[in-house]
């Protein structure tokens, strides 16, 4: 059988939460250490279940879930998101602006594919949720990391962010609350990022 070789597009893609970290954890388990696996964000094994109301809504709507929804997502869910943005005082968000997906992973890949041409840059926090860097590379873009230093509570360094914007910058990734650091950004900091983006 002819060997199958991976695409050269993967040469700059790292996704440690499914590779080296898992391998190191397996080795530690083999050595008798107890490992709590939080690498992929699956909290259900640790008792973080969906609220009862959500579970009941899922059960009640199961008969309606045997087919595809609208390509932008379920209407009622999109409408709930729109109402939430209105409650926050965010003007101008319509149903046509809201797209839902099967978790963040699908939407991250869709967003980078839709946004980036070959060679375009996307500012990504460091440390980052690794799918952003991987998806940016796979989309033909270049991830440019801005600093979020531990000695500053993992907050984004706005001066560093501003300095890294160039002619090929297409966007700034903001993960709030941050994954993997858990940092929660203030409204003032977020407004500062918006000013840089403008």
Language-model segments: residues:
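Aromatic/hydrophobic pocket-lining residues that form π-stacking "cages" and hydrophobic walls in ligand
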Residues: 21, 25, 132, 193
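N-terminal small-domain helix-loop-helix segment of the aminotransferase-like
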Residues: 11-103, 110
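Active-site phosphate-binding strand-loop segment of PLP-dependent enzymes
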Residues: 144, 149-198
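Conserved PLP-anchoring active-site segment centered on the Schiff-base-forming lysine
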Residues: 114-136
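Generic N-terminal amphipathic, Lys/Arg-enriched alpha-helix
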Residues: 1-11
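Short acidic capping loops at alpha-helix termini that bridge into adjacent secondary structure
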Residues: 92-98, 118-121, 168
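A short helix-loop-beta submotif of the ANL/AMP-binding
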Residues: 138-144
């Amino acid at each position: 059988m002819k060997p199958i070789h991976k695409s050269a597009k993967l040469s700059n893609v790292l996704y440690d939460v499914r590779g080296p970290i898992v391998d190191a954890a397996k080795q530690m388990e083999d050595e008798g250490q107890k490992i709590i696996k939080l690498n992929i964000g699956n909290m259900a094994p640790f008792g973080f279940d969906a609220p009862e109301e959500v579970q009941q809504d899922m059960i009640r709507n199961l008969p309606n879930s045997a087919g595809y929804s609208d390509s932008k997502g379920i209407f009622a869910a999109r409408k709930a998101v729109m109402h939430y943005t209105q409650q926050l005082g965010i003007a101008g968000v319509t149903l046509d602006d809201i797209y839902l997906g099967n978790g963040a992973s699908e939407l991250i890949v869709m967003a980078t594919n839709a946004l980036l041409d070959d060679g375009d840059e996307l500012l990504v926090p460091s440390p980052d949720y690794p799918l952003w860097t991987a998806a940016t590379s796979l989309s033909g873009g270049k991830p440019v990391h801005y600093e979020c230093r531990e000695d500053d509570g993992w907050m984004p360094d706005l001066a560093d962010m501003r300095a890294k914007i160039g002619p090929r910058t297409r966007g700034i990734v903001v993960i709030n609350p941050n994954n993997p650091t858990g940092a929660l950004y203030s409204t003032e900091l977020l407004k500062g990022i918006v000013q840089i983006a403008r």
